[in-house]
């Protein structure tokens, strides 16, 4: 049984959203079962399209040869990373109706905790 990894993303900033994807893709590439749970402004990472793609930091990161958010999102999908937008977080931030990327679930914290089980949780 592989060790599960849960990534709880509460920040809507580019740096934390980007690194949540770096951690998720890296862990999934190593065979770990990964779930990203985005809440509050962190839900913006899972929007379709994500406004983080237009953040000036995105171009700077890519210009330095680092994979950007679009590449990492695609990698996470390909690697089977589960993506959940927090229902309460969407409501709290006035984001109900935000178009989410295909395959993104809307669920609550209990669903996230159940998915991670006895695994690790990283909060960004």
Predicted segments with their positions:
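Short, glycine-rich nucleotide/cofactor-binding loops
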Residues: 5-18
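Short, well-ordered secondary-structure micro-motifs
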Residues: 18, 46-49, 96
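Histidine-anchored nucleotide/phosphate-binding helix
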Residues: 18-30, 36
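Hydrophobic/aromatic ligand-binding patch that stacks against planar heteroaromatic rings
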Residues: 23-27, 75, 112
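Short internal beta-strands
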Residues: 34-40, 83-87
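N-terminal beta-loop-helix "entrance" segment that forms/cooperates
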Residues: 42-55
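A glycine-rich helix N-cap at a beta->alpha junction
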Residues: 54-84
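N-terminal glycine-rich phosphate/adenylate-binding segment common to multiple enzyme folds
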Residues: 84-124
């Amino acid at each position: 049984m592989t060790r599960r990894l849960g990534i709880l993303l509460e920040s809507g900033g580019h740096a934390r959203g980007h690194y949540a994807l770096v951690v998720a893709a890296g862990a999934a590439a190593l065979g770990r079962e990964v779930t990203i749970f985005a809440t509050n402004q962190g839900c913006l990472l899972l929007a379709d399209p994500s406004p983080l793609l237009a953040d000036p930091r995105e171009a700077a990161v890519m210009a330095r040869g680092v994979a950007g958010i679009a590449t990492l999102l695609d990698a996470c999908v390909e690697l089977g990373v589960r993506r959940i937008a927090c229902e309460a977080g969407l409501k709290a931030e006035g984001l109900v109706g935000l178009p989410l990327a295909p395959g993104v679930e809307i669920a609550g914290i209990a669903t996230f905790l159940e998915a991670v089980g006895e695994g690790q949780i990283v909060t960004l």
